Swiss-Prot record:
Domain of life assignment: Bacteria
Similarity comment: Belongs to the ATP-dependent AMP-binding enzyme family.
GO cellular component, one term: cytosol
Keywords recorded for this protein, A-Z: Acetylation, ATP-binding, Ligase, Magnesium, Metal-binding, Nucleotide-binding
Organism listed in the record: Helicobacter pylori (strain HPAG1)
Residue list for modification N6-acetyllysine: K623
GO MF annotation list: acetate-CoA ligase activity; AMP binding; ATP binding; metal ion binding
Name of the molecule in the record: Acetyl-coenzyme A synthetase
Catalytic activity: acetate + ATP + CoA = acetyl-CoA + AMP + diphosphate
NCBIfam families, sorted: Ac_CoA_lig_AcsA, PRK00174.1
Length: 662
């Protein structure tokens, strides 16, 4: 019955709030179509004019787009710019006393940072990096930090002096941190002693110590530690230095480095299907332009708005919509330390009420969890300040969408269901809150200037209602520029599978369906990446970790639907010598494998289900038939062609286990 209700609700069309639409930047579909037409008529002129109007340049660019070495595209060639200057300095004349950042700590502490204060702190931090740690333009700096204001200072300080920052999510294990440090060949690592989570200290420095032990990261010269929770920690003499003790001795004046448009701004590591994380490389100018434009178009950001994106800065959403996008627009951005559930599940709604949040951006996983923990909890708070709601990271189901729309938005806020990726830098497909009629769980239309299409493997367009591969058929300014140190992997990952008019196009790895009106609905991953609570986890990485258990011979991991997390991890495990285990042993083995995953990858990687099988279904070339295993895990009929299997009896044995468990 619930499924029928969801399907019926998903067909409904919700028009933008009329009062909101009247004052929106893009007020109706005619204006949207005019922008799309303008971009289609003269693609380079469209992007060039936006770059001239929206960004502050030290030296103008002389060419909008250089495609000579495609797919290594260059945007705004020979222009000189600085991201930190665009996010801070240019606002000082009119907004120096405006609040740039509102910070609320887990333990109730509170901090307000004006643009003038932000300018001072970023400059002092930049001088500290230059003068005391010899960080220069092009050096890589790893930031392993929690959600505190100093994390933003570090990002902007790196941007100011031309260093390339790479943020590693603070929930990642020492091993995952070590891999990223070594791949980036980082010179400096910045962390905090710890943070607070669920009302208790959560330590980070010990993870850094473990990552660096035994000279495991030879490129690292020094470590900079921010004192946050003041718990006693160990220091390595000559390597570890305390930020809080040094930064105030630095000058608050630091001239921004003149950066080329195409110089790397940051690396952000994301899961790859081979198991080795990919260092996604983003540029200065193109990335910042799209961060600002999507804030203006998708969130209709206004000068007096308080904008809150709940993402961690360790993910691309935190980069673009906690830091760079809001600050490029001169807006006020909120930063929250800790979890949604401490001291109770009303924390987020209290924050929206207290800080008069106008635009609120979060994940479907968070929405589902808050819905499950207190369907009517939001009714205790005044959420009338909200004007736009947004979702990110994964498709949102109709039930969660409906609750978000009705209970959080009071049936008056547009929901911008955004589709994009680490590699795209910013939104690609999204409703516009003042213009686009919306449907539950539908990303709707590509943004102006973006050529997103759903294609078959042969490059032809799918028919309405047919599932295909979501591709982007023209370059755009904020696109990934390379995989750090691995050009071949960049081409193989994104530009090697589907051609349109004889040229390879960007393959997103997501499946999608387009309807007769051009609206696009995202289905989910088509490759070996599982989206758990908005976090992309490579199945190869999970399999590699599980296989380290002494009892495991081999395994295969697939994603299955999860009502809270979006997707969960289901493992098919072959044990040593055909060993079998009873229920108690099975649960203990699951616990041990999850411990390994926590150590190797982080707590976000956790097996939800395990099936112990005698073997895995493989083709004669040795490839595991994952789609077949996914069908079994989801308890769907097997429709795959089994003729290529090396041993069809393996499938029969697995199916007999399924029947026994039922």
């Amino acid at each position: 019955m619930q499924l029928d209700d969801d399907l019926e609700f998903a067909k409904k069309i919700f028009n933008p709030n009329r009062a909101f639409a009247k004052q929106a930047r893009i007020k109706n579909m005619c204006e949207y179509k005019d922008l799309v037409h303008e971009a289609n008529e003269d693609y380079e002129h469209f992007w060039g004019e936006l770059a001239k109007q929206k960004l502050t340049w030290f030296k103008p660019f002389d060419k909008v787009l250089n495609s000579d070495n495609a797919p290594f595209f260059k945007w705004f060639e020979n222009g000189k710019i600085n991201v930190s200057y665009n996010c801070i300095d240019r606002h000082l004349k009119d907004k120096k006393n405006k609040v740039a950042i509102i910070f609320e700590g887990e333990m109730g502490d509170y901090n307000v940072i004006t643009y003038r204060k932000l300018h001072s702190e970023v400059n002092k931090t930049a001088n500290l990096l230059k003068n005391e740690f010899n960080v220069k333009k092009g050096d890589r700096v790893i930031i392993y930090m929690p959600m505190i204001v100093e994390s933003v200072y570090m990002m902007l300080a790196c941007a100011r002096i031309g260093a390339i920052h790479s943020i590693v999510f603070a929930g990642f294990s020492p091993e995952a941190l070590r891999d990223r440090i070594n791949d980036a060949q980082a010179k400096l690592v910045i962390t905090a002693d710890g943070t607070f989570r669920k009302g208790k200290p959560y330590m980070l420095k010990p993870a850094l110590d473990k990552a660096l032990e035994n000279n495991a990261c030879p490129s690292v010269e020094k470590a900079l530690i921010v004192i946050r929770n003041a718990k006693e920690i160990d220091y390595v003499r000559g390597r570890d230095f305390v930020y809080n003790e040094m930064v105030n001795y630095q000058s608050d004046k630091c001239e921004p480095e003149m950066m080329d448009s195409e110089d790397p701004l940051f690396l952000l590591y994301t899961s790859g299907s081979t198991g080795k994380p990919k260092g996604v490389q983003h540029s200065n100018a193109g990335y910042l332009l799209w961060a600002q434009m999507t804030m203006e178009w998708v969130f209709d950001i206004r000068d007096n708005d308080n904008f809150w994106c709940t993402a961690d800065i360790g993910w691309i959403t935190g980069h673009t919509y906690v830091v760079y996008g809001p600050l490029a627009c001169g807006a006020t951005t909120l930063i929250l330390e800790g979890t949604m559930s401490y001291p109770d599940y009303g924390r987020w709604w209290r924050m929206i009420e207290e800080y008069r949040v106008d635009k609120f951006y979060t994940s479907p996983t968070a929405i589902r969890m808050l819905h499950a923990k207190g369907e009517n909890e939001p009714l205790k708070y005044n959420l009338e300040s909200l004007k736009v709601l947004g979702t990110v990271g994964e498709p949102i189901n109709p039930t969660a969408w409906k609750w978000f729309y009705e209970k959080i938005g009071n049936s008056k806020c547009s929901i911008v269901d955004t589709w994009w990726q680490t590699e795209t830098g910013g939104h690609i497909i999204s409703p516009l809150p003042g213009a686009t009629p919306i449907r539950a769980s539908c990303a709707t239309l590509p943004l102006p200037g973006i050529h997103a299409e759903v294609l078959n493997e042969d490059g032809t367009k799918t028919k309405p209602g047919e599932q295909g591969f979501l591709c982007i058929t023209k370059p755009w300014p904020s696109m990934v520029r390379n995989i750090w140190g691995d050009e071949k992997r960049y081409i193989d990952s994104y530009f090697s599978q589907i051609k349109l008019n004889g040229e390879y196009v960007y393959l997103s790895g997501d499946g999608a369906i387009v309807d007769e009106n051009g609206y696009i609905t995202i289905i989910g991953r088509t490759d070996d990446i599982v989206n758990v609570s908005g976090h992309r986890i490579g199945t190869a990485e999970v399999e590699s970790a599980i296989s380290k258990h002494e009892m495991v011979v081999e395994c295969a991991v697939v994603g299955i639907p999860d009502t809270i997390k979006g997707e969960g991890l289901f493992a098919f495990v072959v044990l040593c010598d055909g060993a079998k285990c009873n229920l108690g042993e099975s649960l203990e083995l699951l616990k041990e494998m999850n411990h390994i995953l926590s150590v190797e990858i982080g707590k976000i990687a956790k097996l939800d289900n395990v099936m112990y099988v005698p073997g895995l279904p493989k083709t004669r070339s040795g490839k595991i038939m994952r789609r077949l295993l996914k069908s079994i895990a989801k308890k769907e009929p097997i429709t795959q062609d089994l003729s290529t299997l090396e041993d069809v009896n393996v499938v029969k044995e697995i199916m007999s286990i399924v029947q026994m468990e039922e």
